[in-house]
């Protein structure tokens, strides 16, 4: 009636198949997806495959990047400037622009604290009982090609309780680096 759309964001608890099922079930031009390019790593998928599966329903994109740090229980994803992490933005954005040339894209630097993806623990899988293993293969390739050294300090200035001026400089630097990266690949 009002021409308003709802674009559900893929947070750390929804696979691409979950969101595809939601969109297909609701079957409305006013229901779609906000693709967060970093959040897909929390559900053991990789951004290009995730976007491809949901392409007909994309309405908005949050540009976010993460580095991957192994743990005994799985891995941590740690925010970083765009282009410094594992997301292949040139290929991903070319794919999205091919199908949605006017889609809104915003920089979202991400969580101030690392997210711990405990994929090696049984309780992680309780949330995803019907996962299809082949959906996770591209993620595993991405993981193993980009995993950081186990002894690398992954903590952000927020997690180290740095002073406010250090936090402000960190936030500004990551934003400016992200904008420069997007300019460098011709997005801005």
PLM feature spans:
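Generic enzyme active-site microenvironment
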Residues: 7-9, 34, 106-108
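Histidine-acidic metal/acid-base catalytic patches
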Residues: 16-30, 41-188
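Short, acidic/turn-prone active-site loops that include or flank metal/cofactor-
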Residues: 35-39
């Amino acid at each position: 009636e009002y021409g308003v759309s709802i674009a559900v964001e893929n947070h750390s608890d929804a696979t691409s198949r979950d969101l595809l099922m939601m969109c297909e079930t609701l079957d409305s031009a006013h229901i779609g997806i906000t693709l967060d390019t970093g959040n897909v790593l929390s559900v053991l998928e990789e951004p290009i495959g995730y976007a491809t599966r949901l392409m007909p329903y994309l309405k908005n994109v949050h540009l976010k990047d993460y580095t991957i740090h192994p743990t005994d229980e799985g891995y941590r994803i740690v925010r970083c400037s765009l282009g410094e992490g594992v997301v292949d933005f040139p290929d991903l954005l070319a794919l999205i622009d091919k199908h949605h040339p006017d889609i809104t894209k915003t920089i979202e630097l991400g969580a101030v604290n690392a997210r711990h993806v405990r994929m090696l623990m049984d309780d992680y899988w309780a949330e995803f009982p019907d996962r299809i293993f082949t959906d996770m293969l591209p993620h595993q390739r991405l993981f193993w090609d980009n995993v950081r050294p186990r002894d690398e300090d992954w903590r952000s200035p927020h997690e180290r309780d740095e002073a406010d001026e250090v936090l402000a400089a960190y936030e500004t630097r990551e934003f400016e680096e992200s904008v420069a990266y997007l300019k460098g690949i011709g997005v801005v």
